[in-house]
Design a protein with these regions (language model features):
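Membrane-embedded catalytic cores of phosphoryl/pyrophosphoryl-handling enzymes
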Residues: 39-40, 53, 63, 78-205, ...
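Juxtamembrane helix-boundary/capping and inter-helix hinge elements in multi-pass membrane proteins
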Residues: 17, 46-49, 114-118
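Interfacial segments of alpha-helical transmembrane regions
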Residues: 43-62
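N-terminal transmembrane-helix/juxtamembrane module of multi-pass inner/ER membrane proteins
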Residues: 1-35, 66-93
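Hydrophobic alpha-helical transmembrane segments
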Residues: 28-48
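Short helix-capping/hinge motifs at transmembrane helix termini and TM-loop junctions
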Residues: 47, 73-74, 139
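Transmembrane alpha-helix boundary/anchor motif
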Residues: 3, 47, 64, 68, ...
Length: 214
């Protein structure tokens, strides 16, 4: 976290209005886990089970990596530096990188890459930027948090899209991802800290997907 990032958040805090706060509280919901779960369930039952698996996997893998980085970096949230943060119930754990931004950037850009429609790519870009701005406006993340979150989210969706095209047996992708992440999760499991709870839950989802695929 740099000094100018804190000053930027203070400047944004001065721009808050009742309307903007309600607006950005609505936008930030796009990055929440509940929406991702509802999306996957809808895809599974109404669209395509394989697509649902892929969206679920890339997002869960992305959020697991997000949790690992958070707990290595251990950057405190802006409210610990005097920022009057809003919607603190969405700001669990450490600050860097932004989980909401990364999660949304992952699954939304995955759709953009999958369907290759110009209008969809433009819409996804606007929404990713909106979610990132919402996290800054609400004072729960620094600019660097959301920028890195976007880069990681889009990067993981690109990698996932590539692997799904090249590797025909999806079970291998699920299993190897689970095995690669396991040492990090076991390491953090030795530390009794409630801040790791979200990472454990997300990792468990990947393990479940790997298990049911066999």
């Amino acid at each position: 976290m740099f000094a100018f990032e804190l000053e930027f958040l203070k400047w944004l805090e001065g721009l808050r209005t009742s309307f903007l706060t309600v607006f950005f509280e609505g936008i930030t919901i796009l990055g929440e886990e509940t929406l991702i779960i509802l999306l996957v369930v809808a895809l599974w039952f109404a669209v395509d089970k394989k697509l649902a698996q892929q969206v679920f996997f890339v997002t869960a893998a992305s959020l697991s990596l997000n949790g690992i980085i958070k707990n290595f970096a251990q950057v405190p949230r802006p409210f610990t530096k005097g920022i009057n943060s809003v919607r603190l119930d969405t700001a669990t754990g450490y600050s860097f990188p932004s989980g909401h931004t990364q999660g949304f950037a992952t699954w939304s850009s995955f759709f953009a890459l999958k369907f290759k429609k110009t209008w969809l790519s433009i819409l996804v870009s606007i929404l990713i930027a909106s979610v990132a701005i919402s996290r800054l406006y609400l004072g729960v993340h620094y600019p660097g948090d959301v920028i890195v979150g976007i880069l990681l989210g889009v990067g993981i969706s690109i990698l996932g899209n590539y692997l799904f095209k090249k590797v025909k047996d999806l079970k291998k992708i699920y299993l190897w991802t689970f095995l690669i992440l396991t040492p990090f999760i076991v390491c953090f499991a030795c530390i009794a800290d409630p801040l790791f709870a979200d990472m454990f839950k997300t990792f468990g989802m990947i393990g479940g997907l790997a298990a049911v695929s066999f």
